[in-house]
UniProtKB/Swiss-Prot annotation:
Cell compartment(s), UniProt: Cytoplasm
Protein name (database record): Methionine--tRNA ligase
Alphabetized SUPFAM superfamilies for the sequence: Anticodon-binding domain of a subclass of class I aminoacyl-tRNA synthetases (SSF47323), Methionyl-tRNA synthetase (MetRS), Zn-domain (SSF57770), Nucleic acid-binding proteins (SSF50249), Nucleotidylyl transferase (SSF52374)
NCBIfam families (UniProt xref): metG, metG_C_term, PRK00133.1
Statement: the UniProt record of this protein carries the keyword Secreted: no
Gene transcribed to yield this protein: metG
Quaternary structure, from the entry: Homodimer.
Length: 711
């Protein structure tokens, strides 16, 4: 663990440009990384918060083929969407680059050449899967088959998304090409491999011995499992037509493997930022007094904790990550998030449909963050978090303080009189919160830290509820001056402590309190007010108060200062807004079922005479009742136009008797009678299933009379 670092390099996993950003990405990576970076800046730390678009690899080529465009058009489209979404959502990157940039191609090529020239790669001719019909090798997601570890029949050539195992394409059982559907053959090809087995002792000492107590159990456990299972050489090149050329002779038609190329994107993005800011990039990656932290999802643990560190170690001049606080997965309404199935809450759509509610989503995702286990996002929980917590606790406290200050003192903060024991206890408790929240943030427990932030608002609400200044004002207005002064100190503290978690709210609260007018007052406070930080998204962080000022000063907002009028920080979200989102997901679910529903194979051929033997009539259900002691059966009286007959039908789990009386149906009238539970059934009701797999009646769309035949 890096002690007292001079600077921080914070990386967030490069989002893949084959689709927009969804809430799973935010909860797993970008919101916690942003909280951490903003927190460090509030302490005046030197922070480089780095990210960029991951634009190479098989998934990009597949997306381009599917959309009938070039890979460049695909990455340009999604890089634009992703970049704008992050900016609008307030993710405060110092630099957001892209791996298609020249600086990245140069950096990745140079990194490869360094290891190549040092003899760190194994050059080997191996047999790889090849699609003879498409005339190309099948890397990664160009092939699908059964996972050898969990029997998932839809595992990819690089990873099984069901069990999380990292695979080679040749590991798959019964592989199929995703290009043509053909069974691939094995064909020889030359590639370069990073011999991970050579780094097993280094990784064991560095991680298993050195980070046993400070890395998250889910990360440590997965890494230990990999190391204990025995590390093997890992390919760093691929037979592809999209990506970074392998920069050595004899490598024509080969590209750098995306998981060799992508993490180097952190370095090239840092170079890009440093060049723009007139800084030296190397200390952020090569100085032992720099703390390097990778924020990722659990599916990237092996790459950031084993492969990339082995690459850095092999190169020889880079520092290693101090921590990799990977999160588990976020599910949506009980189901796994899926870009391909459109089962997601897309960030760009959320920002359009919930304008000015960036912080509500940040709050909901952090409150329910999958820090140690998979968690579930539901729209009802999102609504409850907003209405019952942000509105009722945080917003309610601030609104009461500002309204009362304007009502009693025309917005001018009163001079306090003598503090009571309750006042002093409340202010002392307030001063303790920065350290409490810091402890959680610095251990990457952001959900816990957010809970402590809300406890600050609860402290304010409790103080007002116990002191009741609106009642005291009648008999002791001098006492109310002190009460309001104390409450305003809590509000001022919230404007700082909320900034990492709820940056838009913090900025709005700072504006309401007119903290920008207090620079002279804060001259004796932290040096941070003299610094102005501007990130790549043009989000200005211009705080007049630093994090530690709350613990060190009692007059965060002084007597005589005039605040602004009250504005609602949060608005209640109505049921109709939430139902609209739930309906949207239900429509997606129905569409997915319809798309994935495969028709049953055609039955053996019959002669026309065989069909002509069936007497199918239109009828109407006159009566319906449940069959005693039979959960699946209904006893129906049906007018077939020929007669009224009894038919026993196995539809009780799909329909109640009441809802089908009067229903028009198709009846196989000349089916031989059959006794079911002692009741003779004289025919069969024809049914099918809809896109959701539910039983539905086969009935005429025109007004055919009972007894009409189906020919």
């Amino acid at each position: 663990m890096t002690q007292n670092p001079k600077r921080y390099t914070i990386t967030a996993a490069l989002p893949y440009t084959n689709g927009p950003i969804h809430i799973g990405h935010l909860a797993g990576v970008y919101v916690p990384a942003d909280i951490y970076s903003r927190y460090l800046r509030l302490q005046g730390k030197d922070v480089a918060f780095i990210c960029g678009s991951d634009e190479h690899g098989v998934a990009i080529s597949m997306k381009a083929k599917k959309e009938g465009v070039t890979p460049q058009e695909v990455i340009d489209k999604y890089d634009g969407i992703i970049r704008k979404s992050f900016a609008d959502f307030g993710i405060s990157f110092n630099n957001y680059s892209r791996t298609s940039a020249k600086i990245h191609h140069d950096t990745a090529s140079e990194f490869f050449r360094t290891l190549y020239d040092k003899g760190d790669f194994i050059e080997e001719v191996t047999e790889q899967l090849y699609d003879a019909k498409a005339n190309q090798f099948l890397a990664d997601r160009f092939v699908v088959g059964t996972c050898p570890k969990c029997d998932n029949p839809e595992a990819y050539g690089d990873q099984c998304e069901k069990c999380g195992s990292t695979l080679n394409a040749t590991d798959l059982i019964n592989p199929k090409s995703t290009i043509t559907g053909e069974t691939p053959i094995l064909k020889e090809t030359k590639h370069w491999f990073l011999p991970l087995d050579r780094y097993s002792d280094f990784l064991t000492k560095w991680i298993l011995e050195g980070h046993k107590n400070d890395w998250k159990p889910n990360v440590y456990g997965q890494v230990k499992s990999w190391i204990d299972g025995g590390l093997e050489p890992r390919a760093v090149t691929r037979d592809l037509d999209w990506g970074i050329d392998v920069p050595v002779e004899g490598a024509e038609g080969k590209k750098l493997y995306v998981w060799f190329d992508a993490p180097i994107g952190y370095i090239s993005s840092t170079k890009e930022w440093a060049a723009r800011e007139g800084k030296d990039w190397e200390p952020y990656w090569k100085d032992e007094e720099t703390k390097l932290v990778h924020f990722i999802g659990k599916d990237n643990i092996v790459f950031h904790c084993i492969i990339f560190p082995a690459m850095l170690k092999a190169e020889g001049s880079y520092i290693l990550p101090d921590n990799v606080p990977a999160n588990e997965f976020l599910n949506l309404e009980g189901n796994k998030l899926s870009t391909s199935k459109n089962w997601a809450v897309w960030l760009h759509e959320y920002l359009e449909e919930f304008p000015d509610k960036q912080d509500v989503l940040r709050y909901a995702l952090t409150s329910n963050a999958p820090e140690t286990k998979d968690n579930d996002f539901t729209w009802k929980d999102f609504q409850a978090r907003n209405n019952n917590e942000l509105v009722a606790i945080f917003g309610n406290f601030v609104n009461r303080v500002v309204v009362l200050t304007n009502k009693y003192y025309d917005g001018v903060i009163p001079t306090p009189n003598e503090f009571t024991e309750i006042d002093e206890q409340t202010l002392a408790e307030l001063k303790a919160y920065p350290a409490v929240i810091s402890s959680s943030v610095e251990r990457y427990r952001f959900r816990e830290a957010l809970g402590e932030l809300m406890n600050v608002a609860r402290l304010g609400n409790k103080y007002l509820a116990d002191e009741e200044p609106w009642k005291v004002m009648k008999d002791n207005p001098e006492r109310v001056k002190t009460q309001m002064y104390v409450a305003l100190q809590i509000a001022a503290a919230l404007s700082v402590l909320a900034e990492p978690f709820l940056p838009f709210t913090a900025a709005k609260l700072s504006k309401i309190l007119n903290l920008g007018d207090l620079k002279e007052h804060f001259e004796g406070f932290s040096k941070f007010l003299k610094e102005r930080h501007q990130d790549a998204n043009d989000i200005i962080i211009d705080k007049t108060l630093g994090w530690n000022d709350i613990s060190e000063n009692s007059d965060l907002i002084p007597a005589g200062h005039k605040i602004g009028e009250a504005e609602l920080l949060f608005a209640k979200i109505e049921d109709e807004e939430i139902q609209k989102q739930i309906d949207k997901l239900e429509a997606t679910k129905t569409a997915n079922i319809a798309e994935n529903q495969k028709a049953e194979p055609q039955k053996d051929l019959i002669q026309f005479e065989d069909f002509a033997k069936m007497d199918i009539r239109i009828g109407t259900i006159l009566e319906a009742e449940k069959m005693p002691k039979a959960n699946k059966l209904l006893v129906l009286k049906v007018d077939t136009g020929i007669d009224v007959r009894t038919i026993v039908s196995g539809i009780a789990e799909s329909f109640s008797p009441e809802e089908i009386i009067g229903k028009r149906v198709s009846v196989l009238a000349n089916l031989a009678p059959r006794a079911l539970r002692g009741v003779e059934s004289q025919g069969m009701i024809l049914m099918t299933t809809n896109a959701e797999g539910k039983l539905v009646f086969v009935n005429p769309d025109a007004d055919a009379p009972n007894g009409a035949t189906v020919n």
